[in-house]
Amino acid sequence: MVMLIMLVSLIIIYRKLKIGERGSRKMEVLLVHINFSVYLGWISIATIANITAFLVDIDWNGFGISPAIWTVSVMSVGIVLALLFIYLHKDIFYALVVDWAFLGIYLKRTAPGTEAVLLVISAAIIGMIIISVAIVLAIIKKRVYVIRKSEL
């Protein structure tokens, strides 16, 4: 419950700061916007992880769908969120957090002594590629809230 309150609070702050919108001063962007983007990204990922852990803890059967399919479905939500933040808010920093989380999933699933679930490993790799390409394209097209054409 605390994570959900934090998530909602950060979403409200993010919107009030107008992250990704024009008119922000460079120092405000560097010192405030980027930090809130990263923080919101981590709280988003942590909320998803905590909900997943809770469902596992209560032995939720996932409506009979395999855990690997559920994992990939949840990872897909992460990909969609990252892409939405890139394209709606020009926010690559939120997306970088999701990319980093996918790297963590990949590293954990490929570590010695860990059950390697090929579907989850593949989803992590594909997710990192999709998000990374979207980030690079946003940078190339100068669709990043840190880069303003007037400052180039």
Features from the language model and the residues they span:
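Central hydrophobic cores of alpha-helical transmembrane segments
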Residues: 93-105
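A loop-to-helix transmembrane entry motif
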Residues: 32-40, 60-74
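Membrane-interface transmembrane-helix boundary segments in multi-pass integral membrane proteins
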Residues: 64-80, 107-133
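Membrane-interface helix termini and inter-helical loops of multi-pass transporters
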Residues: 21-25, 53-65, 110-114
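Membrane-helix interface "capping/anchor" motifs
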Residues: 83-96
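Membrane-interface capping segments at transmembrane-helix boundaries
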Residues: 15-20, 135-151
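Alpha-helical transmembrane segments and their membrane-interface exit regions
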Residues: 4-15, 102-105, 127-133
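Alpha-helical transmembrane segments of multi-pass integral membrane proteins
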Residues: 2-15, 32-50
